[in-house]
Amino acid sequence: MTYYGGKELGAAFRTVRKNTIQIAEDIPENKYDFKPAPDTRSVGQTLVHIALSSGFQHHVHSNKINDLKVVNFPELMEKIGSEEAKPRDKAQIIAMLKSDGGKFASYLESLSESFLAEQVMMPPGAEPATKSRFEMLLSPKEHEMHHRAQLMTFERMIGVVPHLTRERQARMAQAQPAQR
């Protein structure tokens, strides 16, 4: 028995996605084109990238691929890249975050411990040579958290206090003893 299975993976992913959606809602639509530097993704592009980023892992594991050398990486990356490039407004991006996130979380919740324990061969030359499906399926959450940290920095740059900071500030204010 493990302490962290499919249900826990799904719940953790839902929590991370909920926070990403809150950031997407907090940033004004007229700031979705904001880029902190010319050669980086904009707010909107980063959110779309997040929404689509679980697609690779979903493809690998829902198709029960056990050796990544059979994956046509150029074709898959081209497909994801063309989907990322489609223009979308704020409402469409938030809807995509909700829909794709919900589908992936539900998929995670359906997975058995035995499936999560299966080993998948990495591409030739990769270290380690194999990874468990469990480890691989953690990566979309980790990847999203990486980009969410970027988005929270973007928020500060455009004058928005991140929601987690606002919540912490509210808790701290409530904890202060009443002033006389």
What are these regions (language model features)?
Residues M1-A11:
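Extreme N-terminal tail/first-helix region
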Residues T2, E78, K98-S99, R156:
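Generic detector of intrinsically disordered, low-complexity, polar/charged segments
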Residues G10-R14, I21, D33-K79, Q119-R180:
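Short, contiguous alpha-helical
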Residues T15, I27, P38, L111:
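Residue-level signal for short amphipathic helical patches enriched in basic/charged
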Residues P28, Q57-I65, L108, S112-F115:
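Membrane-helix exit/interface motif
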Residues K79-M121, T130-H146:
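Acidic/histidine-rich alpha-helical segments that form the ligand environment
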